[in-house]
Amino acid sequence: CLKNIHDLLGMSFYVPAYQRGYRWGAGQVKALLDDIWDFTLNKSTTFYCLQPIVVTRGNNSWLVVDGQQRLTTIFLILKFLEHDHLRRPLVEAYQVSLYQLDYETRPECTDYLLSLSEEQSSENIDYFYLFGAYQAIKEWFSDKNYNENNKFLDTLLAKSNTENAVKVIWYDLSDECADNDYAIDVFSRLNIGKIPLTNAELVRALFLQKSNFKHHDTRLKQIQIAHEWDVIEQRLQEPAFWHFITNTSKKYATRIEYIFDLMKGKKETYEAFY
């Protein structure tokens, strides 16, 4: 079905262990803003539709199978407009709060989304991308006046189905998703062939399949492995340590992939990384 962005307000979303962090760059963020702004000005169609948000029902939240990047970017746009345009909490203007994003293995990211501190942005790769996206949003809005900001926000958060609204394709897998393995399989299939996912991130998803663990310790082991994976990645992102262990000229979006290349005996190529 289709949902207005306004319909997502007040919801709680949970990003499971098999997913990597936020990785959109400034170009992708600004392209989304341009598209929404173009729709705001022209409104040649009844609604502007984002790519699917794929979810399953959790206990008190929606588990995100696919669409984390889009959900996070919209969150950051609304966070900026709340702070710099409305200058008051969204709940005061719209009687409902901004939706919440929680992470199974990176709970500190939930707090960082509230502060978006420049000082902390170099602490890990997730903060780096989140802060970069927020700065791109600030830059994009820098030449917009109050009325233009208001138009943009009114379009983004249009309430009724009769208004020109921004919508997402909402795909609820709850009835089909008997276990975590099915969600991981869907996640992998949806992302094969997409630029954002690296080989290492697909390997991570496969490692965390429920069938790899005994039933009594499945969740504990999944969380432990996902946490250790993130710790390794953060260590590899430290410039001094990275240059100590490698002299490769190849650029890795996720540096743990270098370890897999070593294990496989993969020779370096000079193809550009995209």
Residue locations for each model-derived region?
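Covalent nucleotidyltransferase
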Residues: 1-274
